[in-house]
Amino acid sequence: MAQMHTPMMKQYLQIKAKYQDAFLFFRLGDFYEMFNEDAIKAAQELEITLTGRGQGEDRIPMCGVPYHSADSYIARLIDKGYKIAICEQVEDPKTAKGVVKREVTKVLTPGTLMNSKLLAEKENNYLLAFASEGEDGWGIARCDLSTGESDVTLIRGGSAELLQEIAASGVKEAIAPAGLEEELKAKLGEQQGFVVSYEEQEDVPKEYERLINHIQQPLLKRAYGRMLHYLLATQKQSLRHLQQVVFHPADSYLKMDVHAKRNLELVQTLRDKKKSGSLLAVIDQTVTAMGGRLLRQWIERPLVDRKAIAGRQAVVEAFLEHFFEREQLRDCLRQVYDIERLAARIAYGSVNARELVQLKRSLQNIPEIEATLEQVGLGGRWLNQSEQFADLVALMEQSLVDDPPLSLTEGGLIVDGYNEELDAYRDASRNGKQWIAELEQSEREATGIRSLKVGYNRVFGYYIEVTRANAHLLPDGRYERKQTLTNAERYITPELKEKEALILEADEKLADLEYRLFADIRKQVEAYVASLQKLAADISEMDVLAGFASVAEQNGYTKPTITESRDVAIKGGRHPVVETVIKRGSYVENDIDLTGDRDMLLITGPNMGGKSTYMRQLALTVVMAQIGSYVPAAEATLPLFDQIFTRIGAADDLASGQSTFMVEMLETKDALVKATPHSLILLDEIGRGTSTYDGMALAQAIIEYIYETIGAKTLFSTHYHELTRLADSLHTLRNVHVSAVEENGTVVFLHQVIEGAADRSYGVYVAELAGLPKQVTTRAEALLTELEHLPQRPTSASVEQPVDSAKTETAATAEEPQQLSLFPTDEETKPKQPTKKERSVLAKMAEVDVLHLTPLQALEKINEWQKQLNK
């Protein structure tokens, strides 16, 4: 039997049909209600009560959240990646004929939030869209709707490069073409950290062409157009606050892929994904939300422009030379609210009176900020805008009360004296309420009832209340009974009824006029949006650079020299994060020398000795230098790097079914394929995910490839001590090691990196520190002693010859079995005949033209052969 729906439910179902991919928050009075599947899912996600509407088979699942506290529920759903369509009542229920008219006024998605309660203060909330066309690669457009910032970039490559760019961009939502191929759609769906939405239209609407006319590439315009159409569809209003699009050419900043950003823990830690423990946490001494967001952007996109870096360094130096003025400036900046997001909400028409008061207080600090900058010698760099905001500040000072309510419809927003008509209504309301207060006293005297009181509620209006015991004392004829309570009676009189009508009319007109006056003030403020956005950009930059000076002073950083050569020379270098979490003064400083013909350091030494820290230290120093910060070192001379590649740490990629070794090889492949002589490569323990000789052979081949083909500055750590012999034939490679000493059977890690190769790794000692059973570590020590007395095996027969992988095998693969055998038997030393399966794979290997394989194709072949052998 078909369900019989009420007119209201029919309205709900018609609207819901248009928003199948979102929760529909359907406004009913003081609640947002959800029905059917929305209700069931929302009740689970929000842990709220699931009820129902109707009876029996017609019962519809239902749940709801209060309108006034909806933000917290919305935030929880957004955090889980859901979309929410807000359906409001768009006509007054009192005047509605039939069902109240309702419309979806906006769609909230993870990438389109405007409400400051739903946003992280010091993080951008990016939405990204992309477009592609054949071999041209991908056009990427990105926008933070809450600030109005937009940028575009062009990347080359296939779907893997696209996915890396999206992941590295820190976006909350990605907009893909509706007709995206299924394979890429599936890969996008597997990604974590952002949701995927779809939009087909990609032309730039005419009213927004001015924002991107300076950019010629059609691919970028298509991506931007797709993003705009999605924003317009979800926001359902003009996007007047969007700023001119910024084009980021691929070579305009230091590139780091998602692996490098994660491994270096630039903005969050690998383990718990928190800011604490990251580079950002150490150097973020910004005091405004805007400055915090800008610093994060700088860290993720360091400069490659020597002049721009020098400009930032000069400001930091000026702030360091003027301590008192700098701290005075920072005190002023602490009084500045988030002008950038306030400007966006002003343009959006969603700013409230309390936020305009925040803007007023922020602008009142500008003259003092400008005066302080003049004292530091930076008056010409920023601002000089206080005069243009004088009228705006005066408007808000003369119109808005200092502590307005959040609601815009209940009055209390506008100061007395701003509008004559408003003052007249206020006088009427106040005089009427004074008359009411005096009425209570006069009625007590007239009736002799001391407990008589005058009250008010929304249902019955004003009333005179007396106890039942005293009701007989009221004179007949004048008092009309309005309500009977358990212990009291409520009455009205003709005079009270007349005065009530005047008061309520005045209050209603007062609230209506006050809202209209506020809307007019907000409209006048809207004319300043572009200027406010420029002001926000200036304040953000001075905040970041003043913070750089402050952290440099506190942590003893030095100004790096950015050289035009390729030399890297760091004296007394430190890891900026590690030094903050250990006892002050106990951090062991280290030098890094990659000058002259020293391009590559092969780092050996004990586990826990600090090899990975040493490698990350260099990369973080480079990032800090190229964002204009001072660096943790006694002296530092650095070139401009174009890219940083890292392969540090071990991690399976369970989501895509890739092993530790495959992940290791894929990340290494990126470095070998994309690095230039101006890149920095950090490779940690390459080859540990496979057998000893496979790993050693790969490590040597990779070192030789970097030496012969790329020539990039490289730090390569390894436990394969045999590789240290490469320094005899590769003239740009030097051996260094992390030192340790043994005292009375105890190993002391010195964390000092010195020239030369290490002779031991102390792995068994580290196992003891980890708490492995004594029986295990004792046995391991005995086996280690036995192995150390075995005859030395050659490991690098081809070390002194140029490597030709098509013709020459290394000794590691040609002269030994794949894995070291501790206890070989006579039977094990006999050559074994390959199985049928192995012969099949060998035949396929013989057919491969190695010289014409890309590294990725080679990895795919190896993966295919491994699967066949493991069947």
From Swiss-Prot:
Chain positions recorded as ATP binding sites: 605-612
Pfam families assigned: MutS_I, MutS_II, MutS_III, MutS_IV, MutS_V
A single Gene Ontology CC term: cytosol
Recorded GO MF terms: ATP binding; ATP-dependent DNA damage sensor activity; damaged DNA binding; mismatched DNA binding
Claim: Nucleotide-binding is one of the keywords in the record: yes
Job description of the protein: This protein is involved in the repair of mismatches in DNA. It is possible that it carries out the mismatch recognition step. This protein has a weak ATPase activity.
Protein name: DNA mismatch repair protein MutS
